[in-house]
Amino acid sequence: MLGVLSVFGAPSALSAEDDERIALRAFLESHIEASDSFEDRYAAEVWLVDMSARLEPFVADADDRLELLRQIHAAASRSELTPELVLAVIEVESAFDRFAVSRAGAQGLMQVMPFWREEIGRPGDNLTVNTTNLEYGCRILQYYLAREDGALHRALAGYNGSSGSRIYSDKVKRAWTRRWKGAPLDWTR
């Protein structure tokens, strides 16, 4: 608690932005863990073969593609997200470049801001490691989807830090529609 107070000041001085940051930090701390993601081997093979062909323009090596797809599927599944939505977010955020760094300093596939490592007490995490970046990014997106009651446009705007604008979410929707479309998603909100 003292760490929170030293970063944000006295509890009465917390702004709505600080409250949200604290809530997201608690959510991340409680949800970063590992589990298996495919129902069975057949489902895994069908999905991996299909998505591997779609990912080939971004990742040339077949083994690298399959490993990345397994990692994406696992992180998305743990976060109760469709892997195809995560693929669309990654295409827009980094074009699948795990070493991508934004002008604001966001890093990796899902362009996670480095301050989250300190916020959740994991300062040694490397955001250019795919599994780490995917876990952070998927959990952050999961948080915003829950906060926005499943409204994709608003959740994606929150993820991107562009609340109130549909520019980013429309880019993700275009990527999803053009390349990653899988299970139906409600893009009406």
What are these regions (language model features)?
Residues 9, 13-16:
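Boundary at the C-terminal end of the N-terminal hydrophobic targeting segment
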Residues 22-23, 31-189:
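Catalytic glycan-binding domains that act on GlcNAc-containing polysaccharides
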